């Protein structure tokens, strides 16, 4: 009898342990389900965001991977004439980042809009109404440099030296003599720089320190009026 009683007690304890394990498993399952539910909500939000971004990009006149629709509106207000459309003619992420890549895609093209994103996330660029060509200087009375952080436009002050095309061994193009320069292999080195010279005061302050920067991505659009 005593043995039987002990066995019954052991079985009851085992049963209690099993119940506790089952309860713990159920709690874990509930936690997993809750986490899955949260993940599903996050995925849904991300999908909606992507949809909105795609819609925004489709609505943009400037089909850029760098700027959003609000930033596009700012730039459009600066461009001298009302444009009908734009065409992406050069993108370092697709076409390469050398002088020859730029020359192949942009030689003779005008007017153009340059948009740059640095490795630190700064976004700026420039507008050129004259055609890109070898060397320079290239005269342009309508060119300007712009920044989106802070939001500011810098007009050309020396139109006869507004632009410089591909020249020497390492310069892809320049706005002004040294105001805004993009170098050969621009995404692989920090030989790109902003100094300020032939455009309105303040350009130099866009890049802190010595003015040099790495390009994360550079886009050039041909503008159609």
Specify the residue positions occupied by each region the protein language model found.
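Phosphate-recognition beta-domain surfaces
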Residues: 2-225
